[in-house]
Amino acid sequence: MPKGLLGKKVGMTQIFTDTGLAVPVTVIEAGPCIVVQKKTPEKDGYSAIQLGFGAKKERSFNKPMLGHFLAARVRPLRYLREVRVENPETYQVGQEIKADIFAPGEKVDVVGTTKGRGFAGGIKRHGFHRGPMAHGSKYHRRPGSLGAKGPARVFKGRRLPGHLGMERVTVQNLEVVKVDADRNLLAVKGAVPGPKGGLVLIKQAAKARG
């Protein structure tokens, strides 16, 4: 059954296997999440549950959002995200979901927002080559030609300098190495997008392999 959990990236470390191999892992504070709403095919056209995560002061919410939490009889939560499930009937509004829904060895997809890098040039943003660095060169790190003379315009999608980062990125098929159910911590093999403290969504792998 598809499952998911909201969490917060804690940072990276390494875990040693029984054979002494160092495995790089990202530690995620996964949950506890609360089911705030259920979506059913009869009413909404698809099956999903809405999860809430993180504390936030009540005065920071507007009245529509407070009413949404009041209808579910749950405390106000900082983040709300939907997770597709096959049988929303198996969940109850107000139910708490913890990190123990995942087990070591399981494959997961992790969705996060990459670090914002601000305005970046073509070399950093797209991996362009530099121009000649010789004394007579007229350009060194500039983007170069924008296209042919004939169309007399720049085509859509042309790779140019601009804002880098702050994009939603999904990393697929990360292995769950360790689960600490008491502290709601997950250790997944490899890197996860985003800064420390960034919000991540951990889902059952859509294309799990091996």
UniProtKB/Swiss-Prot annotation:
UniProt-listed SUPFAM superfamilies = Translation proteins
Claim: Ribosomal protein is one of the keywords in the record:
yes
| Keywords of this entry | Ribonucleoprotein, Ribosomal protein, RNA-binding, rRNA-binding
Q: Has keyword Iron? A: no
**Which Pfam families does this chain map to?**
Ribosomal_L3
Top-rank lineage group of the source organism = Bacteria
Q: Using the UniProt annotation, give all residue ranges assigned to the region (Disordered).
A: 121-150
The Gene Ontology terms for molecular function here are:
rRNA binding; structural constituent of ribosome
- Renumbered to this chain, the signal peptide range is none
Q: Which InterPro entries match?
A: Ribosomal_uL3, Ribosomal_uL3_bac/org-type, Ribosomal_uL3_CS, Transl_B-barrel_sf
* A biological-process GO annotation: translation
Q: Which GO terms describe its cellular component?
A: cytosolic large ribosomal subunit
Q: What does this protein do?
A: One of the primary rRNA binding proteins, it binds directly near the 3'-end of the 23S rRNA, where it nucleates assembly of the 50S subunit.
Its family remark reads: Belongs to the universal ribosomal protein uL3 family.
- Indicate the quaternary assembly: Part of the 50S ribosomal subunit. Forms a cluster with proteins L14 and L19.
Q: Which named protein is this? A: Large ribosomal subunit protein uL3
Q: Name the gene behind this protein.
A: rplC
